[in-house]
């Protein structure tokens, strides 16, 4: 794979994630993936666990979730992206009652 292919793959993945379709993850993640999450999550092993433990609750809590990349850089073996997630906190998430307020979180992701 070349850098441009890898960069486009990640950009396409974020477009798919904005659909909030859990099955869209299947196109971009290996079934035996490991997601290294922040405190509160730790490491999640396996695509199905990732979808059920991370993305499904997130999509439910932030039904208008949207992710936008600001910068995507790539090489032949890696990709890194940074940008923002936005949404409205509409349901319980990580034992935090919904606030009805908009959120904006900066992210930085790295893939090998």
PLM features per residue range, with description:
Residues 10-11, 35, 58, 79, ...:
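Short, structured motif recognition centered on aromatic/hydrophobic residues
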Residues 1-31:
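Short, low-complexity N-terminal intrinsically disordered segments enriched in polar/charged residues
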Residues 2, 6, 46-47, 100:
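Residue-level preference for long, well-ordered alpha-helices that form the structural scaffold
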Residues 11, 18, 68, 75, ...:
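Activation on folded, globular domain regions of eukaryotic proteins
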Residues 5, 63, 77, 103-105:
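Residue-level preference for beta-strand/loop junctions
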Residues 8, 14, 21-22, 44-45, ...:
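Low-complexity, intrinsically disordered short segments enriched for Gly/Pro and polybasic residues
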Residues 26-76, 84, 88:
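A solvent-exposed, acidic/Ser-Thr-rich amphipathic alpha-helical stretch
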Residues 84-112:
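Exposed beta-sheet edge and beta->alpha loop/turn motif
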